[in-house]
């Protein structure tokens, strides 16, 4: 291990001890914001320090085994211990490198998840509903809260477009690689000849913006229109101009909401979505530049890129960015996304580690 990395890890161990002491203080909960920050820092530092402790213990075990090499009776045992210890040390070193990789500041944020039906008409809209169910079930597995912000339903019960807010720890970190084109191959319910059709949807995952720190919206740059809501909401909504559309004039970005029970609620939701869209554009520009610099296959956030194919006749799902194919489509569509998300996160970590080595 490099001396600079060992010194950094020793500093983190000292900091964990300090944070633990602060959290145990009688005055710790007097400032709840500071208490929450310390709790988060403690949770982030603990796995790093524990792994570093295991690394140092392993180094000590190897040194003890090397001392036994001079004893003829213990030599064979010592050699086996050293070989096993070095393998373990290498694995711990790699784990520490991953733990020390720069954290995405958005990883712990809530997200807005937007699904738009693309080519394929009614079948694409039905697939959009299937994707929404998949992400909703995944959110439930993670005990995240799901809120529908805006929905435009199709005639057959699908969605032309739907936006949901997912609230929960690590929502962005787990789903940020879902942005892009999702293609489905299956026999539609409306198909009488049994032919397989190909349809597509576009998914956009946007981190919820911190309105104060990350996106400043000048009221002079906004055009706010109200109109009659359609669809869900009942007669009351249809009789009043409760739906809200907000346009950010400098960029032309639009956000609208009509699913709330009042114009005030819809305006607040539309402002949140607008801020998230503007923040998302800023992030994508930054990510695309960084991805191009390290020739990244994932994480660029290119919405036009086809990232995944769902083949129903074969029960197959393929992620084209990492050439991963799973024959467990039913499980994935029921929200079992862990294998996919874990593989994508691992690929990004490998890319970042390779970049550090350059």
From Swiss-Prot:
GO terms for cellular component: cytoplasm. This is Peptide chain release factor 1. Its main location: cytoplasm. It is found in: Cytoplasm. Methylated by PrmC. Methylation increases the termination efficiency of RF1. Belongs to the prokaryotic/mitochondrial release factor family. The keyword Secreted does not apply. The keyword Protein biosynthesis applies. Keywords: Cytoplasm, Methylation, Protein biosynthesis. It comes from Chromobacterium violaceum (strain ATCC 12472 / DSM 30191 / JCM 1249 / CCUG 213 / NBRC 12614 / NCIMB 9131 / NCTC 9757 / MK). Peptide chain release factor 1 directs the termination of translation in response to the peptide chain termination codons UAG and UAA. Pfam families: PCRF (PF03462), RF-1 (PF00472).
């Amino acid at each position: 291990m490099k001396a600079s990395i060992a010194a950094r890890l020793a500093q983190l161990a000292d900091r964990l001890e300090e944070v633990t002491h602060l959290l145990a203080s009688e005055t710790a909960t007097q400032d709840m914001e500071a208490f929450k920050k310390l709790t988060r820092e403690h949770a982030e530092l603990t796995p790093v320090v524990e792994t570093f402790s295991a690394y140092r213990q392993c180094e000590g075990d190897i040194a003890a085994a090397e001392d036994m090499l001079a004893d003829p009776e213990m030599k064979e045992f010592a050699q086996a211990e050293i070989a096993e210890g070095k393998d373990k040390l290498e694995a711990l070193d790699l784990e520490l490198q991953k733990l020390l990789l720069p954290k995405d500041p958005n990883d712990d944020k809530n997200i807005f998840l937007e699904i738009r039906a693309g080519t394929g008409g009614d079948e694409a809209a039905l697939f959009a509903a299937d994707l929404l169910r998949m992400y909703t079930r995944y959110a439930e597995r993670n005990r995240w809260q799901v809120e529908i912000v805006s929905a435009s339903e199709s005639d057959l019960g699908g969605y032309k477009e739907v936006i949901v807010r997912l609230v929960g720890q690590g929502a962005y970190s787990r789903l940020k690689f879902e942005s892009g084109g999702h293609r489905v191959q299956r026999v539609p319910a409306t198909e009488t000849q049994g032919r397989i059709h190909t349809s597509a949807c576009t998914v956009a995952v946007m981190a919820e913006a911190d309105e104060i720190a990350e996106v400043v919206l000048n009221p002079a740059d906004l055009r706010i229109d109200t109109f009659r809501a359609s669809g869900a909401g009942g007669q009351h909504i249809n009789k009043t101009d409760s739906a809200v559309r907000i346009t950010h004039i400098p960029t032309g970005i639009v956000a609208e909401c009509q699913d709330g029970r009042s114009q005030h609620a819809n305006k607040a939701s539309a402002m949140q979505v607008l801020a998230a869209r503007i923040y998302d554009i800023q992030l994508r520009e930054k990510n695309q530049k960084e991805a191009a610099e390290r020739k990244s296959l994932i994480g660029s956030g290119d919405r036009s890129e086809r990232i995944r194919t769902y083949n129903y006749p074969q029960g197959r799902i393929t992620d084209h960015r990492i050439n991963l194919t799973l024959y467990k489509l039913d499980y994935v569509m029921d929200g079992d996304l862990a294998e996919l998300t874990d593989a994508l996160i691992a690929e990004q970590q490998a890319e970042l580690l390779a970049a550090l080595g350059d």
